[in-house]
């Protein structure tokens, strides 16, 4: 037990810095009020430079072994997509009919990314992660947590879209 509280499991210092009264009822309540809790997580992301519209991550395709040094750089974006491409690493394109993946992006070559080397059910998985992935990992420092958040948002977004 680390003293985390409420829906978002904020630690006390995060509560002091980022909790907000999102529904404007005069009380900031992350324990009993999901509106304040969600608003506070959004505030945390905003304060950590979340970039609206920027995808979080895409599956990566590797060509050769040039990816190895990139995979050792951690998950803070530290190189561009152009540099990744030069090392034989590319994001799955959303416009490529040959590859079907809901985890794709088509971003400018200047976009800063990180290469994640993970183990999935079928073996090694590689992902190119953007600054928004890094923001998620400021909330919880596990790259597996960051990827789980990404993967859980897909069915939630689909359900929300179906209900509109």
Q: Can you say where each PLM-predicted feature lies in the sequence?
A:
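Acidic, glycine-anchored loop motifs typical of Ca2+
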Residues: 21-30
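Generic recognition of stable, solvent-exposed alpha-helical segments in well-folded globular domains
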Residues: 10, 36, 40, 128, ...
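Substrate-binding/active-site groove segments that recognize
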Residues: 5-20, 41
